[in-house]
């Protein structure tokens, strides 16, 4: 069992790599954003929040209250399919959320940070298409589906998210710098203490190059861990 966190700003490519790596190793791919949106859109969920306002927060790039997101993520990790390992994409975003993972006695084996320029992020996000149910991500230029607008696996329609525009992208990047960037120092210290392994990936590279680099990292260290 290997539990992995993909850390990086929106558009850094971590969602695409999460799908590829989870498929490669047969572990679960947990997209925090898609889990949250799905939960808020299903009427059987009853939150003490205004769901319309919460969806607006998500789409505008603002952080969602910990009281909402943390229980959803922990509940997802507790499901049986995650016992063989998982990738967390989009969570944690703050040190408080990282501590919540520890407090729930969930061990993390690897943290991968995707380092990428703002200009590359904007180019990647504009034109992105998402399969809502699975979180699989495509791009009309860089990673197109086999059929335009159709998910490769299910044949269901892909959508362009409301928050995938330049104005919201900049807002989300500002939020990332304000909160999430401190996770880099936090997890580097955890790595230095031997609690997990932390790596920085050049996210400006092509998808296939990043994928090969990740495979090399995991294969080498998983072999050592075994």
Curated annotation (Swiss-Prot):
Pfam families: ADK (PF00406), ADK_lid (PF05191). It catalyses: AMP + ATP = 2 ADP. PROSITE patterns: ADENYLATE_KINASE. Residues 31-64 are annotated as: NMP. AMP binds at residues 62-64, 90-93, 97, 161, 172. Monomer. Residues 127-164 are annotated as: LID. ATP binds at residues 11-16, 128, 137-138, 205. Its EC number is 2.7.4.3. Its main location: cytoplasm. Consists of three domains, a large central CORE domain and two small peripheral domains, NMPbind and LID, which undergo movements during catalysis. The LID domain closes over the site of phosphoryl transfer upon ATP binding. Assembling and dissambling the active center during each catalytic cycle provides an effective means to prevent ATP hydrolysis. Catalyzes the reversible transfer of the terminal phosphate group between ATP and AMP. Plays an important role in cellular energy homeostasis and in adenine nucleotide metabolism. This is Adenylate kinase. One of its GO terms (biological process) is AMP salvage. HAMAP family: Adenylate_kinase_Adk.
């Amino acid at each position: 069992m290997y539990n992995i966190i993909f850390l990086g700003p929106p558009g850094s490519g971590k969602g695409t790599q999460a799908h590829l790596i989870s498929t490669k190793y047969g572990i679960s791919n947990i997209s925090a954003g898609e889990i949250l949106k799905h939960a808020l859109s299903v009427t059987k969920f009853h939150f003490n929040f205004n769901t319309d306002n919460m969806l607006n927060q998500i789409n505008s790039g603002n952080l969602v209250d910990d009281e909402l997101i943390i229980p959803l993520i922990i509940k997802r990790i507790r499901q049986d399919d995650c016992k063989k390992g998982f990738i967390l994409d989009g969570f944690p975003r703050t040190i408080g959320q990282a501590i919540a993972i520890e407090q729930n006695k969930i061990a993390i084996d690897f943290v991968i940070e995707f380092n990428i320029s703002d200009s590359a992020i904007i180019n990647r996000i504009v034109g992105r298409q998402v399969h809502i149910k699975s979180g699989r991500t495509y791009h009309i230029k860089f990673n197109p589906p086999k059929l335009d607008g159709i998910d490769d696996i299910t044949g269901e329609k892909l959508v362009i998210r409301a928050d995938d525009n330049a104005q919201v992208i900049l807002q989300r990047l500002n939020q990332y710098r304000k909160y999430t960037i401190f996770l880099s120092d936090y997890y580097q210290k955890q790595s230095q203490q031997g609690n997990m392994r932390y790596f920085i990936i050049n996210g400006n590279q092509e998808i296939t190059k990043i994928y090969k680099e990740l495979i090399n990292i995991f294969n080498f260290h998983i072999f050592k861990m075994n």
